[in-house]
UniProtKB/Swiss-Prot annotation:
PANTHER family cross-referenced by the UniProt entry: ELMO DOMAIN-CONTAINING PROTEIN 1, ENGULFMENT AND CELL MOTILITY
Entries under Pfam families matching the protein: ELMO_CED12
Summary of the function given for this chain in its UniProt record: Acts as a GTPase-activating protein (GAP) toward guanine nucleotide exchange factors like ARL2, ARL3, ARF1 and ARF6, but not for GTPases outside the Arf family.
Residues of the ELMO domain: 133-306
Natural source organism: Pongo abelii (Sumatran orangutan)
Descriptive protein name: ELMO domain-containing protein 1
Domain of life where this protein originates: Eukaryota
Record gene name: ELMOD1
Keywords: GTPase activation
Length: 326
């Protein structure tokens, strides 16, 4: 009974607050002569702050046109803006900047949704050793990470040298599908020097090679190693969940002036790999069993950063050269 009453109170509060909000919007329109979309565009700077407010306003609108505008095809955005202006009785000749601002916001909103679909498609596609394209990508990954060491055979224990668990990497891609391979190859190719350095650092000796006394004295270079490829796939999972949950909207809306693309997502992965590697060293774990603890602490730190509407995960490395700040 208590649970039912609590739920009833929450529902009542929701509708009460919604009613008050609609009343406030009505009053503001009468006082300013502007609709909510106009007030947001004129009073909020470009970037995540503006786009997220526009997205909320469109999604929560009573109008079906506004509700569906966040999921239209990119080619229909311009026509959708015209329909919104007509619905709101806004003269585009008197308010020329409004249409431009709304279009920029919708490009980001629709682009983010499409990016999720593109990333999800890669995640759901399993690695197929009979697919020449998949095999070529995998062999390129080795070449980029170990340019001076030939791979003796496709099935080889050498794969463990770059952090796979066995002699055939395809089994390690089951969780993230092709997305994990795409990200690893992107990092290894676009930021080869850094990727090779991170790989080298990940091969640090384990603490078992030292006595307890020696380990306590060795403060500067004692970081526990980790499996580079496996961690890369794990960080891919982190990036994927940040994307799907909407946490990355802040970042993408601040760095992509139009629609965020797969390249933006891969650049974000590179940034997360860099930052996780530094964070791992800072945390100074005693053994690899602490990976989940370190990873969760890192996830919370990234999410906290992304809660700042002005936040952009600004990477400073080769793979980020294509980023355009707003």
């Amino acid at each position: 009974m208590k649970h039912f009453l609590r739920m009833l109170i929450q529902v009542c509060l929701y509708f009460y607050c919604k009613f008050l909000w609609r009343c406030l919007k009505f009053v503001m329109r009468k006082l300013t002569g502007r609709c909510e979309l106009q007030r947001i565009c004129y009073n909020t700077k470009p970037g995540a702050s503006r786009t997220m407010k526009i997205e909320t306003s469109l999604r929560d609108s009573k109008s079906k046109l506004l509700q569906t505008s966040v999921s239209v095809h990119p080619d229909a955005i311009e026509k959708t803006i015209e329909d919104i202006m007509e619905l709101k009785k806004i003269n585009p000749d008197v308010n020329p900047q409004l249409g431009i601002s709304l279009q920029a916001c919708l490009l980001q909103i629709v682009g983010y949704r499409n990016l999720i679909a593109d990333v999800e498609k890669l995640r759901r596609e399993p690695y197929d050793s009979d697919n020449p394209q998949h095999e070529e990508m995998l062999l390129k990954l080795w070449k980029f990470l170990k340019p001076n060491t030939p791979l003796e055979s496709r099935i080889s224990k050498q794969w463990c040298e770059i952090g796979f668990q066995g002699d055939d990497p395809k089994t390690d891609f089951r969780g993230m599908g092709l997305l994990g391979l795409y990200n690893l190859q992107y990092f290894a190719e676009r930021d080869a020097t850094a990727a090779q350095q991170v790989l080298s650092d990940s091969l640090h000796p384990k603490c078992s090679k030292f006595s307890k006394a020696e380990w306590e004295k060795k403060r500067m270079d004692k970081a526990i190693g980790y499996s580079f490829a496996i961690v890369g796939i794990n960080i891919t999972d982190l990036a994927y969940n940040l994307l799907v949950s909407g946490a990355l909207k802040t970042h993408f809306y601040n760095i992509a002036p139009e629609a965020p693309t797969l390249s933006h997502f891969q650049q974000t992965f590179c940034y997360l790999m860099h930052e996780f590697h530094k964070f791992w060293i800072e945390e100074d774990p005693m053994d690899i069993m602490e990976f989940n603890r370190v990873r969760e602490k890192f996830r919370k730190r990234i999410i906290k950063q992304l809660q700042n509407p002005d936040m952009a995960l600004c990477p400073h490395f080769a793979a980020s050269e294509g980023l355009i700040n707003m």
